[in-house]
């Protein structure tokens, strides 16, 4: 790690890797270019993933059930990412975790269980497409390791004494646990001996359609903001709903549950999709709404005649 940081902070001959010193947030007292920042995030996630894999392997050797071992490995990987966030004084180090963990784990779970049934293949297709879309959007909007998302800087300023507790449990661990709960229905597909049925395919289609909605919403938002900075995006999907990207995210996890329900019926595993819906409706959307109302005078009028979701 230290050699990577040294590489990214070489002298003027490495101008493509190092930018000027302003707006510095990390402990190295230097802000890296986007390319080096993305590479650094990748290294961090490899370290976190390796730590989680070692713990999972050890716990399963102790005869712990695989699902519980995976949960604890997920928690450990989150703590590792959180630790690097502390090192760089940037909670945004955690941001890609949401889109990276599910597709990677679902794929590794197929190798772990040796199950490559049609429902599992449908699950992998859906989650890798979704993960590609979400990670791609993160890569487009990511400004570098020296930039922290406005939500986190807001919490820093509002709760300076409690921030690190909020950081670990509220900003890192809660999303990890909600995503894990939403993933559980998908993990059960590896146990099913039944073949896919029409509802399984419908669930996959819901997932693919949801990720496509998000992809379209991303493109429309990026294009609009580039052409009309500071204005409210009210074109395309955004004309019909204030948060089409969040709508797609919520719907995606319901699609995963539909795939599960097609084989097992309705039971307690519906809780993951419900928790995901509650997270967006109770936290993510209200936070975004408050920011938009504060920063864009015409957002109030847009809010009055546009539904919250599509």
Label every model-predicted segment.
Residues 149-156, 228-234:
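Juxtamembrane inter-helical linkers in multi-pass membrane proteins
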Residues 6-9, 13-19, 23-26:
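Short, positively charged and aromatic/hydrophobic N-terminal segments
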Residues 3:
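Cationic, low-complexity basic patches in intrinsically disordered or flexible, solvent-exposed regions
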Residues 66-90, 151:
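Short secondary-structure boundary segments
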Residues 29-36, 85-97, 139-149, 156-174, ...:
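Interhelical loop and helix-boundary elements at the membrane-water interface
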Residues 91, 101-104:
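General structural concept
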Residues 34-60, 66-68, 74, 78, ...:
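Hydrophobic transmembrane alpha-helices
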Residues 80-82, 99-102:
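Non-catalytic, usually N-terminal nucleic-acid engagement modules in DNA/RNA processing proteins
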